[in-house]
Each structure stands twice: as C-alpha cells, then as structure tokens.
Amino acid sequence: MKKFIVVLLFIACKSPKNEWVSLIKNNSLDGWHYFQDNGLKKGWNVENGILIFDKISGLESGEDDASLLSDKIYESFEISFEWKIEKGGNSGFMWGVDEDMAYKFPYQTGPEIQIIDPQVYAKPEDVLGGDIELNNVLGDLDQKKKYLGAVYDLFSPKGELKPNPVGDWNQYYIKIDQKNNKGLLKLNDVVINEFPLSGPEWDDSFLKSKFNKSEDYPYLGEKRWYDFAKFKKGAICLQDHPGKAYFKNIKIRELY
C-alpha cells in the first residue's frame, strides 16, 4: 500500500508538467515580455485571442529588437500554434534564447524556425525588409535554407510544402527534444523538417552557415554568434521582423 501511494504521489507531481498549456491568457500579453524590455518597446498586442505584431520592424527602423519572449524557460517541449503573415512578410519562432545584455538580438543564441511568404522565392522583389531581406532570398533560391519551414540557414524543409495562401491561417507543430537530440516540424499536420539539435550533422550545417562567420557581422557586438545554439534551456521567442504577423491557439507542453 505504501508503495502504491508513493507511485500516485509521483504521478501527481509529474502530471502538471505534461499537460498542454495555453500561452495566450486573459486576452493579454501575460506570460510574455519584450526582449531585454526597458519599458519603452512596443509592437505586440492581443485582440480576440490573437497575438499580433504590427509595427515597423527593428530591421527597418533601426530601433532595438522588439521580439516577444516567454517569461518561462523551456528545455524539451512541443508547441502548436496557428500563424499568418502579410504578403512579402517574414517572422519566426526561436528556442533556447538567452537574454543577457551582452546580446543585441535573440537570434544570437536562439535557432529559428522560419516563417516567410514562400511566394517571395518566385518574386524576390516582393519581400519586405529592403535590401537585407532581398539579398537573403536571392542568395538562397537553390538551397532554401531560409525558406518557409527551414531551420534558418541550417536545415532546409523536405518535400513539397503545401501552405495555405498568404493571409490565411497555417499551423506549425514543433518538437524540441533535447534529451533525445531531435527536432521536428509539421506544417498543417505534415512533417516538413526533422533535424538534430547537436552532434556531427548539426556541426556540419553550422560550419556552412552564416553563424560560423561571426567576424563578418560586427553589428552584433562582441558576442557575435559565438554562443549560438549553446543554451539547451532558454526562452521561446516570436520574432520582430518585417510585416504584420498573427498568432493564435498557442499551446505548449513540456516533455519531461
């Protein structure tokens, strides 16, 4: 009987961690904050349960990054959310983000699952964000490591993607399993990317990416990309980037 009670107590202690939790609460930004928030940043709001980014991006304005970070720190998890962007728009989901003031941007530490209007690969001139984003697309037309569903500049999506049109809702399901070194992405219930989180395959992709060329990016400051993907535990992040972006039905579940 004593052993049975101990087992029940163990299950009771573990179960809350394994439940799906909504990340949009009270129709507000409760549970979220701006990257390195100084009380002056703006651009995100919640309307009717929809999380909205609606401002000129920091990339375009030169203002400090206003990406949105979770208050809670995560390690291994699965997350599901619906998203939509405007024509030519660009956003992203990051994990493992560290908020030390030594970093100027969340993407200095956090890998990114790319969200972008895929039609800009057919008409690059339609991409929002000026020459920087235009050159990103033009330099990636073949490899598609910055395409919709890519782990940005590391792993291209697989197979034929079938996103809903720009302006309609799409769904991402993302699993980050640090314990088993596995990442997975589904677009509208179809697996489009599977990738490691460390190890030889990751290292090989990293060596070929811009993240291995820190000296070419002095605007990042002293830390550059030296700590990229080094933090297994970190905040999750929705990116401040060109174009309006909308997110709803954001749910997360810790794996362990």
Can you name each region flagged by the protein language model?
Residues 13-256:
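Carbohydrate-interacting regions of secretory-pathway proteins
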Residues 3-12:
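Sec-dependent N-terminal signal peptides
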